[in-house]
A protein has these predicted regions:
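Structured, active/binding-site neighborhoods that engage oxygen-rich ligands
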Residues: 1-170
Length: 170
């Protein structure tokens, strides 16, 4: 996968993170339609590395006008099984916002990844970054479990496994 890029070049994950950052800077707030438009513009260019799921969502005709509806439709068409991690890599920038981190991370994730497991992972990582930047301390294990369970209880067992020092248990 990585061999398609020159050393030091960024991937689709960084491109999409920049779509989020550019929209926030331009609008001076989180405007989901603006972010969706940036995603669509990027996808209609040369979106090297774009995943199949993200491609499918962004290439539905009325995506920009109804991004949540389109994202949910593609997820439902998969039998509610698609839970890829594409939303996670790009929403980390949301953790740098001073307020509304959880809502913004959840909403931005849902622009392309509607599955609640995807949403929870984006919220957890964004909240972790926010906590480290603004309080210099990470979220507690209990806080992470609480966030996960608010979105999808299936995540709890993976949070439990993360306490183990052996990555093979995951």
């Amino acid at each position: 996968h990585r061999s398609r890029w020159k050393p030091g070049a960024w991937t689709d994950d960084t491109d999409m993170m920049l779509c989020i950052a550019d929209a926030i800077i331009k609008d001076k707030s989180v405007n989901l339609i603006s972010i969706a438009q940036n995603f669509k513009d990027w996808a209609c260019g040369i979106p090297m590395g774009i995943g199949r799921h993200t491609f499918n969502v962004l290439h539905i005709g009325d995506y920009v006008e109804k991004p949540f509806d389109v994202s949910k439709l593609i997820w439902e068409m998969s039998g509610k099984r698609i839970a890829s991690n594409g939303g996670l890599m790009r929403t980390s920038v949301v953790g740098l916002l001073s307020t509304n981190v959880e809502k913004n991370a959840a909403d931005i994730c849902r622009l392309t990844h509607y599955d609640p497991r995807c949403v929870a992972s984006c919220v957890i990582v964004s909240r972790l970054i926010h906590s480290l930047v603004y309080t210099s301390s990470p979220l507690t294990y209990v806080q992470i479990k609480d966030i996960a369970c608010r979105y999808d209880e299936r995540i709890d067992s993976f949070i439990e496994l993360s306490k183990n020092n052996d990555i093979r248990t995951l």
